[in-house]
Amino acid sequence: MADCYTELEKAVVVLVENFYKYVSKHSLVKNKISKSSFRKMLQRELNHMLTDTGNRKAADKLIQNLDANHDGRICFDEYWTMIGGITSPMANLIRQQECQQESQQECQQESQQESQQESQQGSS
């Protein structure tokens, strides 16, 4: 069945599987990643996209920021928030690279059109 998945579907499956790879099987708290496992995940899985993944204080700060319910563990929704926080700047970076490859004039025209639309919406 996995062979028929699209690239996007495969990417979602990888993200979900990655979460459960770091959930402790022996924990009393099910379906959550402990601080130590989360630090391991950052170091092993996101060391190219996030800076200071080996820095314990930086990892603990990220955990604190993600841990919406303040239980000291990362649930799937909190993990997904982190993924969104990574992908949004990545999307902007990819778009900037695409703009550099296209003619600057086309990107400027697109940007001007967007600005005009925003100003028209703002004056409405």
From Swiss-Prot:
Residues 97-124 are annotated as: Disordered. Homodimer. Interacts with TP53. It comes from Mus musculus. GO terms for cellular component: cytoplasm; cytosol; extracellular space; nucleolus; nucleus; plasma membrane. It comes from the Eukaryota. Calcium-binding protein. Binds one calcium ion per monomer. Can promote differentiation of adipocytes (in vitro). Overexpression in 3T3-L1 preadipocytes increases their proliferation, enhances adipogenesis and reduces insulin-stimulated glucose uptake. S100A16 proteins, but not other S100 proteins, have only one functional Ca(2+) binding site per monomer. Upon Ca(2+) binding, undergoes conformational changes leading to the exposure of hydrophobic patches which could be implicated in the Ca(2+)-dependent nuclear export. Binds Zn(2+). Ca(2+) and Zn(2+) do not bind to the same site. Does not bind Cu(2+). Keywords: Calcium, Cytoplasm, Metal-binding, Nucleus, Repeat, Zinc. One of its GO terms (molecular function) is identical protein binding. It is found in: Nucleus, Nucleolus; Cytoplasm. Gene3D superfamilies: EF-hand (1.10.238.10). Disulfide bonds: none annotated. This is Protein S100-A16. The keyword Zinc applies. Its main location: nucleus. Ubiquitous. Widely distributed throughout the adult brain and predominantly expressed within specific astrocyte populations. Expressed at high level in adipose tissues of obese animals.
